[in-house]
Amino acid sequence: NSSYVTISHNRKYLYSITDFGVESYRILEDGSLSVINHASINGMRGCYLSTDYEDKFLFVAGYHDAKLTVLRVRENGEIGEITDEIYHKGLGSIAERNFKPHINCVKMTRDNRFLCAADLGMDHVVVYELNHMNGRLRQVDIIRSEQESAPRHLKFSKDGKLLYVVHELKNYIDVYTYSVDKEHRMPIFEKIQSISTLNDYHAGGSAASALNISEDFKYLC
């Protein structure tokens, strides 16, 4: 059974999480799909996947095992070998999540340099530098959120200069500026705003789950 799906940036291929790992499809002219291949992620079922902006690598977030998997993508859309596997470790702050790390979203910066991984169990976003030659990741930063806020989903602005992070349990969005230190080639994230996703008259029982931006890039949903 498929769950989360994503489309390559060249709009030619669709990738899906399945029971056995990930699967790739060719998008035909009539909109139908043709299976290309499938690949194991060597772990528990993923919850989110995305590609880099050159469509050379596929990233899979693991909620259940806190595993981040990187797989190579070939020019014909076929999923290749695993190039890196990283397990988030540590003691989380949320009792109902068993005090464990849970990776829920992975997304590249728009300049295609860094991969951001939202861990709602650890209340932070881990930032990795991607080696475009071998598909390996190197941790370079951590964006820390409020305790028990559960950062769940990420979105970058059209120009790539702003990062939006929605927090599931406390129902608010943090806004960060993004830039790169040219001397040290390191990412810089600075928080400029926190805004609630709830109205003043909200009665409770809400949990923020995802972010999207309107086609005109004027509204965050």
Labelled PLM ranges:
Residues N1, S34-S40, G90-E96, R138-R144, ...:
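A short beta-strand motif characteristic of beta-propeller blades
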Residues N1-D55:
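Blade-loop segments of beta-propeller domains
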Residues I7-R11, Y53-D55, R110-D111, K158-G160, ...:
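Residue-level detector of Asp-centered blade-edge/turn motifs that repeat once per structural unit
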Residues D19, Y63, V73, L120-G121, ...:
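Short loop/turn segments immediately following the C-termini of beta-strands
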Residues Y25-S32, L71-G80, E129-R136, Y176-I188:
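Short loop/turn segments immediately following beta-strands, especially the blade-tip
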Residues V35-C105:
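Asp-box/WD-like beta-propeller blade repeats and closely related beta-sheet repeat scaffolds
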